[in-house]
């Protein structure tokens, strides 16, 4: 075990000894969804590796990405709250205190944070025996059996896209009827419900805007990335990526390879509102796996972004042509993030780049 994980385990044990069980909040009225806390959990000091972090790392300059995947179900549940602990320097003690007012915890776990996250889930369950706990994120998508066997505090885990699985549970649907989840039944036997169909383009347009939840629950001045203007806001206009690169996180553990796009009208409307909500923001970042993979759609979106006078950047393909680049530049694009993984043809072949 890494030394830093040992340190987190020690802190958990200390918390077990010092925390007294806190009283539960009042039960919600009939017909209301479970009062839900969405959590990107506390992590190692200055480590950006939790919810939605594409490049987990501890950097010389403290920096964090937004927990965008948690914003969509958070925006669909009345009374919910999104807590992004690392950039806001919220401790586990503070998280546990917050949970006294909630009935359901949705925690976005990561491979590097797994040991600490499962230990804290067990402590939370000891403190609030009635609370329901679901884990989402890469390690539970790839190894659901291991997750459920190692962490006895879990009520269930979600595999891959979890937006509607979480909503259905919070609104009272029985576990055995919810697609895309795994759980232990009353006999302790792990049950894997059938996979949930990927969210459709039409559903993407109907979902809440991530930037609205940022404005509701987060302090955007806490977020910074060295290569972007500060403060910045990141969001997605698509899900999925048709490329088969073996090293990429989200297509393989969350969004899959089917490329689905929001309408350009929906994206432009969100950006117009975001500019009004965040006058202090210097730059927007489209964190799509490959923002400009479809020329016609990229140019159409740029035509709608151009009147807004935004500064923005994105992930890009090296094969982007001149016409597309010109449209992007005229619409306010400042920077392209392009992957140069190797100069060795065999390595590129091996990683399916």
Q: Which residue stretches match the model-derived regions?
A:
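Acidic, low-complexity intrinsically disordered segments
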Residues: 2-270
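Radical SAM [4Fe-4S] cluster-binding motif and immediate context
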Residues: 210-353
């Amino acid at each position: 075990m890494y030394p830093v994980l040992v340190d987190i385990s020690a802190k958990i044990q200390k918390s077990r000894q010092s925390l007294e069980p806190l009283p539960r909040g009042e039960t919600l009225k009939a017909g209301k969804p479970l009062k839900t806390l969405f959590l990107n959990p506390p992590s190692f000091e200055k480590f950006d590796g939790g919810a939605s972090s594409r490049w987990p790392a501890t950097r010389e300059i403290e920096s964090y990405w937004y927990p965008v995947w948690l914003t969509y179900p958070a925006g669909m549940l009345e009374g919910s709250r999104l807590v992004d602990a690392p950039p806001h320097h919220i401790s586990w003690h503070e998280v546990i205190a917050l949970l006294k007012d909630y009935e359901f915890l949705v925690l976005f776990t990561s491979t590097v944070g797994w040991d600490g996250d499962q230990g804290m889930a067990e402590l939370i369950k000891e403190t609030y025996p009635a609370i329901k706990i679901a884990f989402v994120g890469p390690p539970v998508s790839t190894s659901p059996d291991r997750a459920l066997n190692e962490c006895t505090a879990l009520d269930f885990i979600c595999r891959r896209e979890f937006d509607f699985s979480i909503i259905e549970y919070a609104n009272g649907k029985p576990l055995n009827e919810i697609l895309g989840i795994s759980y232990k039944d009353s006999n302790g036997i792990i049950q894997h419900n059938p996979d949930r169909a990927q969210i459709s383009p039409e559903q993407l347009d109907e979902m809440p805007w991530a930037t609205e939840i940022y404005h509701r629950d987060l302090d955007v001045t806490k977020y910074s990335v060295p290569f972007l203007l500060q403060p910045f806001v990141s969001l997605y206009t698509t899900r999925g990526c048709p490329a088969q690169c073996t090293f990429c996180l989200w297509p393989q553990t969350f969004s899959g390879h089917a490329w689905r796009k929001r309408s350009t009208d929906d994206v432009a409307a969100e950006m117009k509102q975001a500019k009004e909500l965040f006058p202090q923001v210097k730059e927007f970042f489209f964190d799509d796996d490959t923002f400009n993979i479809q020329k016609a759609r990229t140019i159409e979106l740029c035509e709608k972004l151009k009147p807004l006078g935004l500064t923005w950047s994105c992930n890009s393909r090296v094969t982007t042509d001149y016409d597309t680049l010109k449209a992007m530049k005229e619409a306010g694009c400042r920077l392209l993030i392009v992957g140069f993984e190797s100069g060795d043809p065999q390595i590129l072949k091996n990683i399916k780049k």
